[in-house]
Structures are given as structure tokens and as C-alpha cells.
């Protein structure tokens, strides 16, 4: 059973709404809803009811809450007990997708450096398919990337669903990517063809028979965002990668469907690989950072 679902439930109780819980956990509101629905299915009970503007625990939910607090306390105790007596050392080879490396990994690295200062960390940004193969071929110890399939030989820890968003500058807000059979006289700005969110976007356009003027390939997410802001075209990126630009109005979100499409972020290593103290500490830092946001 996924401990994050219990953390989500605890956060909804503390914050009083799914929206505020999603903001605190740095995930989408749909992810919070999904976690609660999974728990309700698991225990065959309704956990929340809406009273006024607040989400309140049902009677059955109140019965479960003390046990959930106890479970999270026990898990914290287990984590402490699992810590190695000696400080982690040696070399650790980590590979990550660019958006995760740029926007989610700095917090991970900060935690890791504080806990494992003796470890020689090798960190590389790679395509998600290449990361999967590097882990399978023992060319890397740990990968933080988006799930792309064919990973049964990996030990995976899912880090949550990351919502994708279609963005443009306010000056080209009149393009339409929802009406089938339409041609948009703008460019699609993205990175390499094997990019996971590029594949999702282009697949959706094919299904809708929508075309664009051309595709511009750039190697960095920052370059993509700067070109979009300069009215050169649109892009399709993880929401967390453009959150600041959306908040300040430099970019706007374009309609792309009734529900946001998502990709699964995960931390993984080869299932047959012995987990070193450095690997254990790094994975722990990844999980803590993603839960904390």
C-alpha cells in the first residue's frame, strides 16, 4: 500500500480542502482526489463529505484517522532504524530527465549533500528512454525520470503524476488546439523526438487531425520557454516547469482538453542491484523532497 496516500489523507484533514492539500503537497488536485479514491476503495468506506466549503471526515474516516497518524509515525521510526551506522561514501552515478533535474532535483541535492558529504556524486541529464536503458545495463545507479515502459527489471518508486500544460505567450492566445481538423499557423517548440511529453502532444494532434506550421527543436527547457515568451510558438511542458511564468503572466495556459494529461515521475534502480548506503540515502532524499514539494 502506498504511504503517500495516507500522507495525502492526513494533509487534506489538516488543510480542510483538496485544493489546499494539493498546493501543500505540490501536486495536482486530481492526484489528491485519486489518492483519496484509492483509499476509499481499499477500505470500502467514504472518507470525506463536503460541509460548507470544507471537506470534513465522515464518521468512518474519523475512526481511521488515529491509525493513519500512528502509521506515519511508525514509518518515520522505521526510516530512522534503517539508517546505516557509517556515513555513506564512495561514488554514486545518478541520471535524470532535464525538467526534473532543473526544477525538482536542486532540493534533493541539497538534502543529499548535507547527509552524505563524502559521496562523489556523478549527475547527468539524459532522455528518459536512455535513462531506463542505462539502469538496465548498470551504467547508472539511480535514475529520476518519467516512466516510459519496459521497466519490469527495475525497482521503481513512483513520485506522483505530473500534469502537462500547453503554454503560449499572451500575444498568441487565439490559437485553438481543441477543434479537430484545424491548422494553427504557429510553431511547436520542444526538444528531441523521444521526449515523453512531445510524444503525448504529437499523438494527441494526430488523433484530432490538428497541424502546426512547423516544429522547432531546442536542447534546453529554458531556451524553449524563452522562445515561447517571445511569441515564436507554443510548447507542451510539465506544469511545474512553467509555474513561475504562468503565475507572473509571462506565459498563459491554452485549452487542450477537459482534463490535464499527466506523466509519472519515478525514482528507480536495477532490481538486482545491491542498494548501497549512498543509494539508500539518495532515494530517501528524493522521496522526501517530492512529498515536501
UniProtKB/Swiss-Prot annotation:
Record GO terms (molecular function): DNA-binding transcription factor activity; transcription cis-regulatory region binding
Ranges of the DNA-binding region feature: 18-37
Chain ranges of the HTH lysR-type domain: 1-58
Alphabetically ordered keywords of this record: DNA-binding, Transcription, Transcription regulation
GO biological process, one term: regulation of DNA-templated transcription
Tree of life domain: Bacteria
Similarity remark: Belongs to the LysR transcriptional regulatory family.
Descriptive protein name: Uncharacterized HTH-type transcriptional regulator YfiE
Organism of provenance: Escherichia coli (strain K12)
Amino acid at each position: 500500500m502506498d504511504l503517500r496516500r495516507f500522507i495525502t489523507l492526513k494533509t487534506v484533514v489538516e488543510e480542510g480542502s483538496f485544493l489546499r492539500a494539493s498546493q501543500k503537497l505540490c501536486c495536482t488536485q486530481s492526484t489528491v482526489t485519486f489518492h483519496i479514491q484509492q483509499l476509499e476503495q481499499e477500505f470500502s468506506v467514504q472518507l470525506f463529505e463536503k460541509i460548507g466549503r470544507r471537506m470534513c471526515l465522515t464518521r468512518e474516516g474519523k475512526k481511521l484517522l488515529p491509525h493513519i497518524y500512528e502509521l506515519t509515525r511508525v514509518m518515520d521510526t522505521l526510516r530512522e532504524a534503517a539508517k546505516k551506522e557509517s556515513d555513506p561514501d564512495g561514488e554514486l552515478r545518478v541520471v535524470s530527465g532535464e525538467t526534473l533535474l532543473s526544477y525538482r532535483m536542486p532540493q534533493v541535492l541539497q538534502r543529499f549533500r548535507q547527509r552524505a558529504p563524502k559521496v562523489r556524486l556523478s549527475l547527468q541529464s539524459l532522455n528518459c528512454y536512455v535513462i531506463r536503458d542505462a539502469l538496465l545495463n548498470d551504467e547508472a545507479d539511480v535514475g529520476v525520470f518519467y516512466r516510459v515502459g519496459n521497466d519490469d527489471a527495475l525497482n521503481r518508486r513512483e513520485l506522483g503524476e505530473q500534469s502537462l500544460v500547453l503554454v503560449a505567450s499572451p500575444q498568441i492566445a487565439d490559437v485553438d488546439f481543441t477543434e479537430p481538423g484545424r491548422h494553427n499557423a504557429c510553431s511547436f517548440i520542444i526538444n528531441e523526438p523521444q521526449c515523453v511529453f512531445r510524444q503525448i502532444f504529437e499523438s494527441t494532434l494526430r488523433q484530432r487531425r490538428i497541424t502546426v506550421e512547423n516544429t522547432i527543436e531546442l536542447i534546453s527547457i529554458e531556451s524553449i520557454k524563452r522562445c515561447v515568451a517571445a511569441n515564436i510558438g507554443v510548447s507542451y511542458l510539465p506544469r511545474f516547469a512553467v509555474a513561475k511564468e504562468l503565475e507572473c503572466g509571462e506565459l498563459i495556459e491554452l485549452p487542450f482538453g477537459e482534463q490535464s494529461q499527466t506523466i509519472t515521475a519515478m525514482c528507480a534502480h536495477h532490481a538486482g542491484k545491491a542498494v548501497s548506503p549512498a543509494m539508500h540515502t539518495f532515494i530517501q532524499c528524493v522521496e522526501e523532497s517530492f512529498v515536501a514539494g
